[in-house]
Amino acid sequence: MGSKIQVTAGNVKIGGGDKVSVQSMLNVPSTDIEGSVRQAKELEEAGCEIIRAAIPNKDAVKLIPALKEAVSVPIVADIHFDYKLALEACAAGIDKIRINPGNIGSDDRVKAVADACRQRGIPIRIGVNSGSLEKEILAKYGHPTPEALCDSALYHASLLEKFDFNDIVLSMKSSTVSTMIKAYELAAERCDYPLHLGVTEAGTERMGIIKSSAGIGALLLHGIGDTIRVSLTADPVKEVYAAHDILKALDIEKDGVQFVSCPTCGRTRIDLVKIANEVEDKLRNCKKNIKVAVMGCVVNGPGEAREADIGIAGGDGCGLVFKKGEILRKVPEDKLVDALLEEVEKL
Protein backbone atom coordinates (compact mmCIF):
# COMPACT_ATOMS: atom_id res chain seq x y z
CA MET A 1 0.00 0.00 0.00
CA GLY A 2 1.32 3.43 -0.92
CA SER A 3 4.66 4.82 -1.99
CA LYS A 4 8.15 3.40 -1.52
CA ILE A 5 9.63 6.66 -0.23
CA GLN A 6 8.74 7.80 3.29
CA VAL A 7 8.85 11.30 4.75
CA THR A 8 8.24 12.40 8.32
CA ALA A 9 6.18 15.42 9.35
CA GLY A 10 6.40 15.95 13.09
CA ASN A 11 5.30 12.66 14.63
CA VAL A 12 3.58 11.33 11.50
CA LYS A 13 5.22 9.17 8.85
CA ILE A 14 3.86 9.53 5.32
CA GLY A 15 4.44 6.81 2.75
CA GLY A 16 6.78 3.84 2.84
CA GLY A 17 3.96 1.47 3.72
CA ASP A 18 2.92 3.35 6.86
CA LYS A 19 -0.76 3.91 7.74
CA VAL A 20 -2.82 6.32 5.65
CA SER A 21 -3.08 9.57 7.62
CA VAL A 22 -6.02 11.99 7.69
CA GLN A 23 -5.59 15.71 7.10
CA SER A 24 -7.72 18.82 7.22
CA MET A 25 -7.23 22.58 7.02
CA LEU A 26 -8.18 25.44 9.31
CA ASN A 27 -10.78 27.79 7.83
CA VAL A 28 -10.56 30.46 10.52
CA PRO A 29 -8.73 33.68 9.47
CA SER A 30 -5.04 33.28 10.29
CA THR A 31 -5.15 36.58 12.19
CA ASP A 32 -7.61 35.00 14.64
CA ILE A 33 -5.11 33.04 16.69
CA GLU A 34 -7.57 32.16 19.45
CA GLY A 35 -10.16 30.90 16.97
CA SER A 36 -7.54 28.97 14.99
CA VAL A 37 -6.24 27.28 18.12
CA ARG A 38 -9.77 26.37 19.18
CA GLN A 39 -10.50 24.83 15.78
CA ALA A 40 -7.18 22.97 15.73
CA LYS A 41 -8.06 21.37 19.07
CA GLU A 42 -11.47 20.36 17.71
CA LEU A 43 -9.82 18.78 14.66
CA GLU A 44 -7.31 16.87 16.77
CA GLU A 45 -10.09 15.58 19.03
CA ALA A 46 -12.06 14.46 15.95
CA GLY A 47 -9.10 12.38 14.75
CA CYS A 48 -7.24 14.73 12.43
CA GLU A 49 -3.60 13.63 12.20
CA ILE A 50 -2.14 16.53 10.19
CA ILE A 51 -3.47 20.11 10.27
CA ARG A 52 -2.77 22.67 7.54
CA ALA A 53 -2.96 26.43 8.05
CA ALA A 54 -2.78 29.20 5.47
CA ILE A 55 0.17 31.54 6.02
CA PRO A 56 -0.64 34.44 3.65
CA ASN A 57 1.60 37.08 5.24
CA LYS A 58 4.25 37.74 7.86
CA ASP A 59 1.73 38.33 10.65
CA ALA A 60 0.27 34.87 10.06
CA VAL A 61 3.61 33.25 10.97
CA LYS A 62 2.75 34.06 14.61
CA LEU A 63 0.03 31.42 14.36
CA ILE A 64 2.57 28.59 14.01
CA PRO A 65 4.00 28.55 17.57
CA ALA A 66 0.50 29.01 18.99
CA LEU A 67 -0.73 25.94 17.12
CA LYS A 68 2.37 23.93 18.01
CA GLU A 69 1.79 24.64 21.68
CA ALA A 70 -1.92 23.81 21.53
CA VAL A 71 -1.93 20.47 19.67
CA SER A 72 0.38 17.49 19.29
CA VAL A 73 -0.33 16.75 15.61
CA PRO A 74 1.95 18.12 12.86
CA ILE A 75 1.22 21.58 11.46
CA VAL A 76 1.60 22.35 7.75
CA ALA A 77 2.16 25.89 6.46
CA ASP A 78 0.29 26.59 3.23
CA ILE A 79 2.38 29.16 1.36
CA HIS A 80 2.12 30.72 -2.07
CA PHE A 81 4.56 32.91 -4.01
CA ASP A 82 6.59 34.48 -1.14
CA TYR A 83 9.60 32.29 -0.38
CA LYS A 84 10.45 34.40 2.68
CA LEU A 85 7.27 33.19 4.36
CA ALA A 86 8.48 29.62 3.89
CA LEU A 87 11.80 30.51 5.53
CA GLU A 88 10.04 32.21 8.44
CA ALA A 89 7.68 29.27 8.86
CA CYS A 90 10.67 26.94 9.07
CA ALA A 91 12.26 29.13 11.72
CA ALA A 92 8.95 29.21 13.65
CA GLY A 93 8.95 25.42 13.99
CA ILE A 94 6.59 24.29 11.25
CA ASP A 95 6.44 20.53 10.60
CA LYS A 96 5.77 20.62 6.87
CA ILE A 97 5.50 23.14 4.03
CA ARG A 98 2.99 23.16 1.17
CA ILE A 99 4.39 25.18 -1.71
CA ASN A 100 4.94 25.06 -5.45
CA PRO A 101 8.64 25.81 -6.07
CA GLY A 102 7.94 27.16 -9.54
CA ASN A 103 5.79 29.93 -8.05
CA ILE A 104 8.35 31.42 -5.69
CA GLY A 105 10.83 32.86 -8.16
CA SER A 106 14.43 32.24 -9.15
CA ASP A 107 16.62 29.23 -8.46
CA ASP A 108 18.32 30.93 -5.53
CA ARG A 109 14.94 31.29 -3.79
CA VAL A 110 14.04 27.66 -4.40
CA LYS A 111 17.46 26.67 -3.06
CA ALA A 112 16.97 28.80 0.05
CA VAL A 113 13.69 27.04 0.86
CA ALA A 114 15.13 23.59 0.08
CA ASP A 115 18.16 24.27 2.30
CA ALA A 116 16.05 25.58 5.19
CA CYS A 117 13.75 22.55 5.06
CA ARG A 118 16.60 20.06 4.71
CA GLN A 119 18.47 21.50 7.70
CA ARG A 120 15.40 21.10 9.91
CA GLY A 121 14.06 17.85 8.44
CA ILE A 122 10.91 19.52 7.13
CA PRO A 123 9.19 17.85 4.15
CA ILE A 124 7.59 19.83 1.32
CA ARG A 125 4.29 19.01 -0.34
CA ILE A 126 4.01 20.11 -3.92
CA GLY A 127 0.32 20.87 -4.37
CA VAL A 128 -0.78 21.04 -8.00
CA ASN A 129 -4.35 21.65 -9.11
CA SER A 130 -6.20 22.69 -12.25
CA GLY A 131 -5.76 26.38 -11.47
CA SER A 132 -2.02 26.23 -10.82
CA LEU A 133 -0.79 24.81 -14.13
CA GLU A 134 2.00 26.61 -15.95
CA LYS A 135 1.28 28.34 -19.27
CA GLU A 136 3.69 26.04 -21.08
CA ILE A 137 1.93 22.92 -19.81
CA LEU A 138 -1.51 24.32 -20.64
CA ALA A 139 -0.27 25.20 -24.12
CA LYS A 140 0.97 21.64 -24.56
CA TYR A 141 -2.20 19.87 -23.39
CA GLY A 142 -4.87 22.49 -24.08
CA HIS A 143 -6.60 22.15 -20.70
CA PRO A 144 -5.99 20.58 -17.26
CA THR A 145 -5.69 16.95 -18.31
CA PRO A 146 -4.39 14.20 -15.99
CA GLU A 147 -1.12 14.28 -17.93
CA ALA A 148 -0.85 18.04 -17.43
CA LEU A 149 -1.36 17.74 -13.67
CA CYS A 150 1.19 14.94 -13.37
CA ASP A 151 3.77 16.73 -15.53
CA SER A 152 3.40 19.89 -13.46
CA ALA A 153 3.88 18.06 -10.16
CA LEU A 154 6.97 16.25 -11.40
CA TYR A 155 8.35 19.50 -12.85
CA HIS A 156 8.09 21.17 -9.45
CA ALA A 157 9.68 18.12 -7.82
CA SER A 158 12.61 18.39 -10.24
CA LEU A 159 13.23 21.96 -9.06
CA LEU A 160 13.74 20.66 -5.53
CA GLU A 161 15.71 17.61 -6.65
CA LYS A 162 18.14 19.96 -8.38
CA PHE A 163 19.13 21.20 -4.93
CA ASP A 164 19.39 17.73 -3.43
CA PHE A 165 16.02 17.88 -1.69
CA ASN A 166 13.93 14.70 -1.76
CA ASP A 167 11.60 14.85 1.25
CA ILE A 168 8.72 15.50 -1.11
CA VAL A 169 5.00 14.71 -1.08
CA LEU A 170 2.96 15.22 -4.26
CA SER A 171 -0.68 16.06 -4.84
CA MET A 172 -2.50 16.52 -8.15
CA LYS A 173 -6.02 17.55 -7.28
CA SER A 174 -8.91 18.20 -9.60
CA SER A 175 -12.60 18.85 -9.00
CA THR A 176 -13.31 16.24 -11.69
CA VAL A 177 -13.04 12.80 -10.11
CA SER A 178 -11.96 10.92 -13.24
CA THR A 179 -9.21 13.48 -13.94
CA MET A 180 -7.94 13.29 -10.39
CA ILE A 181 -7.85 9.48 -10.42
CA LYS A 182 -5.92 9.28 -13.68
CA ALA A 183 -3.44 11.99 -12.59
CA TYR A 184 -2.55 10.06 -9.45
CA GLU A 185 -2.30 6.80 -11.35
CA LEU A 186 0.20 8.42 -13.71
CA ALA A 187 2.20 9.82 -10.81
CA ALA A 188 2.30 6.43 -9.08
CA GLU A 189 3.75 4.94 -12.28
CA ARG A 190 6.35 7.67 -12.74
CA CYS A 191 7.68 8.31 -9.23
CA ASP A 192 8.01 6.83 -5.75
CA TYR A 193 7.13 9.94 -3.75
CA PRO A 194 4.30 9.78 -1.19
CA LEU A 195 0.97 10.93 -2.60
CA HIS A 196 -1.52 13.19 -0.83
CA LEU A 197 -4.97 12.31 -2.19
CA GLY A 198 -7.90 14.67 -2.53
CA VAL A 199 -10.63 16.00 -4.79
CA THR A 200 -10.29 19.78 -4.74
CA GLU A 201 -13.34 22.06 -4.58
CA ALA A 202 -15.42 18.93 -4.06
CA GLY A 203 -18.44 20.94 -2.93
CA THR A 204 -20.86 20.96 -0.03
CA GLU A 205 -21.08 18.16 2.50
CA ARG A 206 -23.45 16.00 0.42
CA MET A 207 -21.73 16.07 -2.96
CA GLY A 208 -18.26 16.63 -1.55
CA ILE A 209 -18.34 13.40 0.42
CA ILE A 210 -19.64 11.48 -2.60
CA LYS A 211 -16.94 12.80 -4.94
CA SER A 212 -14.18 12.35 -2.37
CA SER A 213 -15.29 8.81 -1.57
CA ALA A 214 -15.30 7.90 -5.26
CA GLY A 215 -11.93 9.45 -6.06
CA ILE A 216 -9.98 8.72 -2.90
CA GLY A 217 -11.58 5.30 -2.48
CA ALA A 218 -10.82 4.17 -6.03
CA LEU A 219 -7.14 5.02 -5.64
CA LEU A 220 -6.73 3.51 -2.18
CA LEU A 221 -8.33 0.26 -3.37
CA HIS A 222 -5.51 0.01 -5.93
CA GLY A 223 -2.80 0.72 -3.36
CA ILE A 224 -2.27 4.34 -4.38
CA GLY A 225 -2.14 7.04 -1.73
CA ASP A 226 -0.46 7.74 1.60
CA THR A 227 -2.39 10.59 3.20
CA ILE A 228 -5.85 12.00 2.44
CA ARG A 229 -7.94 15.11 2.79
CA VAL A 230 -11.66 15.31 2.14
CA SER A 231 -12.33 18.92 1.04
CA LEU A 232 -15.79 20.18 1.97
CA THR A 233 -17.58 23.51 2.04
CA ALA A 234 -18.42 22.72 5.65
CA ASP A 235 -17.00 22.50 9.16
CA PRO A 236 -13.51 20.94 8.81
CA VAL A 237 -14.39 18.48 11.57
CA LYS A 238 -16.81 16.90 9.09
CA GLU A 239 -13.89 16.48 6.67
CA VAL A 240 -12.09 14.43 9.30
CA TYR A 241 -15.11 12.25 10.05
CA ALA A 242 -15.65 11.64 6.32
CA ALA A 243 -12.00 10.73 5.75
CA HIS A 244 -12.01 8.18 8.57
CA ASP A 245 -15.31 6.79 7.29
CA ILE A 246 -13.75 6.25 3.86
CA LEU A 247 -10.82 4.38 5.43
CA LYS A 248 -13.18 2.24 7.52
CA ALA A 249 -15.39 1.47 4.53
CA LEU A 250 -12.32 0.19 2.67
CA ASP A 251 -11.17 -1.89 5.68
CA ILE A 252 -7.96 0.13 5.75
CA GLU A 253 -8.67 1.59 9.17
CA LYS A 254 -9.55 -0.88 11.91
CA ASP A 255 -9.94 1.45 14.89
CA GLY A 256 -13.50 2.45 15.65
CA VAL A 257 -16.98 1.18 14.96
CA GLN A 258 -18.05 -0.06 11.55
CA PHE A 259 -21.72 0.87 11.47
CA VAL A 260 -24.31 -0.79 9.23
CA SER A 261 -28.05 -0.21 9.00
CA CYS A 262 -30.76 -1.34 6.60
CA PRO A 263 -32.61 1.01 4.20
CA THR A 264 -36.00 0.04 5.75
CA CYS A 265 -39.01 -1.38 3.95
CA GLY A 266 -42.73 -1.93 4.47
CA ARG A 267 -42.02 -4.38 7.31
CA THR A 268 -40.39 -1.68 9.47
CA ARG A 269 -42.51 -0.77 12.49
CA ILE A 270 -40.08 1.42 14.45
CA ASP A 271 -38.52 4.83 13.76
CA LEU A 272 -35.36 3.27 12.40
CA VAL A 273 -34.01 6.47 10.82
CA LYS A 274 -34.04 8.25 14.19
CA ILE A 275 -32.60 5.24 16.01
CA ALA A 276 -29.84 4.66 13.45
CA ASN A 277 -28.75 8.30 13.53
CA GLU A 278 -28.72 8.30 17.33
CA VAL A 279 -26.64 5.12 17.53
CA GLU A 280 -24.17 6.32 14.91
CA ASP A 281 -23.75 9.66 16.67
CA LYS A 282 -23.24 8.12 20.12
CA LEU A 283 -20.66 5.64 18.81
CA ARG A 284 -18.78 8.23 16.70
CA ASN A 285 -15.81 8.37 19.09
CA CYS A 286 -15.87 4.73 20.18
CA LYS A 287 -12.46 3.17 19.43
CA LYS A 288 -13.51 -0.48 19.67
CA ASN A 289 -12.89 -2.48 16.51
CA ILE A 290 -16.45 -3.79 16.21
CA LYS A 291 -19.31 -3.94 13.72
CA VAL A 292 -22.66 -2.62 14.95
CA ALA A 293 -25.92 -3.20 13.05
CA VAL A 294 -29.26 -1.43 13.25
CA MET A 295 -31.88 -3.39 11.31
CA GLY A 296 -35.52 -2.65 10.57
CA CYS A 297 -37.30 -5.92 11.20
CA VAL A 298 -36.97 -9.13 13.17
CA VAL A 299 -37.75 -11.26 10.11
CA ASN A 300 -34.42 -10.77 8.37
CA GLY A 301 -32.47 -8.44 10.66
CA PRO A 302 -30.46 -10.86 12.84
CA GLY A 303 -29.75 -13.15 9.91
CA GLU A 304 -28.71 -10.42 7.48
CA ALA A 305 -26.42 -8.88 10.07
CA ARG A 306 -25.05 -12.09 11.57
CA GLU A 307 -21.49 -10.85 10.96
CA ALA A 308 -22.11 -7.87 13.23
CA ASP A 309 -20.68 -8.11 16.73
CA ILE A 310 -23.82 -6.56 18.17
CA GLY A 311 -27.06 -5.19 16.79
CA ILE A 312 -30.74 -4.48 17.12
CA ALA A 313 -33.70 -5.44 14.94
CA GLY A 314 -37.03 -3.65 15.10
CA GLY A 315 -40.42 -5.20 15.79
CA ASP A 316 -43.85 -3.63 16.35
CA GLY A 317 -43.06 -1.00 18.99
CA CYS A 318 -40.23 -3.14 20.27
CA GLY A 319 -37.07 -4.81 19.04
CA LEU A 320 -34.51 -7.54 19.54
CA VAL A 321 -30.95 -7.15 20.70
CA PHE A 322 -28.72 -9.70 19.01
CA LYS A 323 -25.06 -10.71 19.11
CA LYS A 324 -23.40 -12.45 16.16
CA GLY A 325 -26.87 -13.24 14.82
CA GLU A 326 -28.05 -14.82 18.08
CA ILE A 327 -30.96 -13.14 19.89
CA LEU A 328 -30.14 -11.91 23.40
CA ARG A 329 -33.37 -10.27 24.51
CA LYS A 330 -36.48 -8.32 23.53
CA VAL A 331 -36.86 -4.67 24.64
CA PRO A 332 -39.36 -1.81 24.08
CA GLU A 333 -38.59 0.58 21.20
CA ASP A 334 -37.74 3.48 23.53
CA LYS A 335 -35.12 1.31 25.28
CA LEU A 336 -33.45 -0.11 22.16
CA VAL A 337 -30.64 2.42 21.89
CA ASP A 338 -29.72 2.18 25.57
CA ALA A 339 -29.82 -1.61 25.43
CA LEU A 340 -27.53 -1.64 22.42
CA LEU A 341 -25.06 0.76 24.02
CA GLU A 342 -25.00 -1.39 27.17
CA GLU A 343 -24.00 -4.41 25.09
CA VAL A 344 -21.33 -2.39 23.27
CA GLU A 345 -19.82 -1.50 26.66
CA LYS A 346 -19.53 -5.22 27.47
CA LEU A 347 -17.56 -6.02 24.32
What are these regions (language model features)?
Residues I33, E44-L67, R98-S106, I168-V177:
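Glycine-rich, proline-tolerant flexible connector loops at the mouths of alpha/beta enzymes
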Residues K58-I79, A112-I124, Y184-L195, V279-D281:
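Alpha-helix-loop-beta-strand connector modules within alpha/beta enzyme cores
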Residues A70-V73, A91-I97, R118-R120, A188-P194, ...:
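Glycine-enriched alpha-helix->loop->beta-strand junction motifs that scaffold or abut catalytic
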